[in-house]
Amino acid sequence: IMVVSTQSAVNASGDIAGLVNLAVAETNQGYANSGVEITLQLAGQYTTSYVQSGSFSTDLSRFRGTADGYMDSYHATRNTVAADVMMLLINNSSSCGLASGIGSTASTAFAVTHYSCATGYYSFGHEIGHLQSARHDPAADPTNSPYAYGHGYRSPTSAWRTVVNTAIFDAV
């Protein structure tokens, strides 16, 4: 994964490098806890001078755009560092995150996360989960494509949940 942070997120976080490393570690622990044999590796982290728009969908579109004049240079950097997934960390508390969709290709493997939700709320791993074709829990999203069992899960006692389950509590 390659992570790009806005200057606003960098300033607000106090330690963006530590936050990104923790987000990667939490995501990898979630994979391990679920028996998913994937290891997320940080290909690089960068700070952009891009000024957030105030809209997650606009920021995501501008991040994905290759020739729109916003964050175009990061696409070449992505190729250089061989990152499969791109994450933009922003300082916008209107939501915790937004992925390009359920499932992804090289041109759609992009997500945006509010820096303060990236860890603890597990939104960093949550948005990556969507890019890997995982959906929210069936109560929140009953769609069964592309996988009938590709949903978040919460244990019957609520003692734990998967990262794409929409219930908010600590155990993951």
For each feature predicted by the language model, list its residue ranges.
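Fold-level signature of zinc-dependent metallopeptidase catalytic domains
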Residues: 1-105
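The catalytic-center signature of Zn2+-dependent metalloproteases
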Residues: 45-61, 108-172
